[in-house]
Amino acid sequence: MSDRQQVTNAKGERIAIVAGLRTPFAKQATAFHGVSALDMGKMVVNELLVRSELDPKLIEQLVYGQVVQMPAAPNIAREIVLGTGMNVSTDAYSVTRACATSFQSTVNVAESIMTGNIDIGIAGGADSSSVLPIGVSKKLAHALVDLNKARSFGQKLQIFRRLGLKDLLPVPPAVAEYSTGLSMGQTAEQMAKTYNISRADQDALAHRSHTLASETWASGHLRDEVMVAHIPPYKQFIDRDNNIRENSVLESYAKLRPAFDKQHGTVTAANSTPLTDGASAIILMSEGRAKALGYQPIGYIKSYAFSAINVWQDMLMGPSYATPLALKRAGMELEDLTLIEMHEAFAAQTLANMQMFASKKFAEEKLGRNRAIGEIDMSKFNVLGGSLAYGHPFAATGTRLITQVCRELKRRGGGTGLTTACAAGGLGVAMIVEVE
């Protein structure tokens, strides 16, 4: 059996990435304060259809995701279909794979095209850290169910008497892993200690990311892939990411205190991604249908792979496990790539993965390979800046990476690009795209 992955339909046609778009990414409780993930999702999908001059009725499937779920609208994909002029019969369902969510939605639509079930689909993801499902304590939740069953005033009074004042306090969404109780920041601290990653190196990577992102915005390269978002009641708008440190100064990063290990830590707010609001989406088609409709695809999916590792120690190593699988399935080596886009959840996580890419020992002991994945050429790595600067709306990052690397490869005359990300739960993803 061949190790090569056939990312084509029965006619041998490739899976075309026709267009991609995202909202600006905004820090929590800033520009998108009060705007739900669903509203941002509808906003970006509608604008993507308008810019692409694609009849919404031609969309056969929409797969969309969010990580922080909205109890009022758990199937965000279906609500986007109903809110953007598509046929009510359009197939739509929602997915979640933590920070790899919109990679998952992309793969799902691609596989629907590969099987011949559809020719045109939309994938993406959105998340809001400003509109959150605020919960209640377990005791209050239990009491509320009992109240619904109580018949007399006396029974209801007895139920209320079981509650203390602290039971009435709201409960925000958990930021820790369900299985381990560790937050992502605590895991990043683990990785910094395991791989001896210094505070200086973390700050330097963050400074690089912000500097490159600022230069990228100044160049105008992002104007065609980031929409202007008008915020209800439509008296203001946001037209660029608001987390980027303009005129970043490396020395200023050292002033921040550790965020997760107050005494001995090296992970700070400045070398981590902030809680972020935003949405993104891409249009996928079979190669034949794209050409028949007159589109020039921005790229094609060459291979993809998902991975999962232990959640207790250094669980954000997903890129180091998923990347060699995607490379093998594409029949490539790391040095064959034109560009590499790695999600920067934390500088520590990014540097740990970069270190393990170059480690023969890691390859032998963890991957069963006789050679390292490869040394990363920094002239190819996150050349436009990364998530540390742009921000990270969990479900939206994957399709941001895909669109961004495809468009940059187009500007460079084509080539192949790796997009890869870690995700909560010890998950990882890698996708290789090719651009003509």
UniProtKB/Swiss-Prot annotation:
- GO annotation terms (biological process): fatty acid beta-oxidation
Catalytic residues, chain numbering: C99, H392, C422
Tell me the keywords, alphabetical order: Acyltransferase, Cytoplasm, Fatty acid metabolism, Lipid degradation, Lipid metabolism, Transferase
Cross-referenced Gene3D superfamilies: 3.40.47.10
- What is this enzyme's EC? 2.3.1.16
One Pfam entry for this protein is: Thiolase_N
- GO-annotated molecular function: acetyl-CoA C-acyltransferase activity
Q: Which residues form a coiled coil?
A: none
- Tell me the route in metabolism or biology where this protein functions: Lipid metabolism; fatty acid beta-oxidation
Q: Which domain of life is it from?
A: Bacteria
* Protein family per UniProt: Belongs to the thiolase-like superfamily. Thiolase family.
Q: Which HAMAP family match?
A: FadI (MF_01618)
According to its UniProt entry, what is the function of this protein? Catalyzes the final step of fatty acid oxidation in which acetyl-CoA is released and the CoA ester of a fatty acid two carbons shorter is formed.
The name on file for this protein is 3-ketoacyl-CoA thiolase
Q: Tell me the name of the encoding gene.
A: fadI
